[in-house]
Amino acid sequence: MYLTAHSGSDQTPENSLAFANFFKDKKGIDVIEVDVRCNPQGELVLSHDALEKKEYVRLSELLLILEGTTIKLNCDLKEANLEQKVYQLAQKNNQWSQIYLSGNVSLNYLKNWPEQLLINLENFVGRQGRSPMWDEDDACEKLEWLGQQGARVINLSHLFYTERLARKGNELELSFSLWTVDDLADIRRYQDQGIFNVTTRRAMEYLNQQEVFR
């Protein structure tokens, strides 16, 4: 199982260079996640929310910190049409192999980067009326459809990850990436189940707990 440190994990500043510096060489942390947008100057910057008139950390700065490391970076795209920008930036320093893309990702890129796209299932599934929960029948149908499009890894909230969905994914030979799992027992349970990736805000806390139990 990959363990991804959610932006701001373990009380580090969200979408910051301090966050990247803290986790870049931590054994057991496979991936760090940041939120990516494009500013009016055409630069990729880190922010979960819509941009305001202030300075943001540039993705290029964060990539410099990760240069020469083995850790991977999940760029959670908060806007559409950023895939090529991230690719071109990462390619400049031969870092594309370190990158995953999730969030607003076009399925058109599956033919080029099937192993590096974490496809967010919720982008395609309808809701049950006004309920915050989705239609599970539709979710299973969309799971099959995404598999037909070439998806390899399905990204979704662990709250929506049911036994039925797990069985369907297994039938389709799809892997799952679950977010944001902050119960340490749940992380361990998913690890034991062989989940492809778990994203958490308690990454180091989880690793430290597992070390104590050894």
Task: Map each language-model feature to its residues.
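Phosphate-group recognition and catalysis centered on beta-loop-alpha active-site segments
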Residues: 1-214
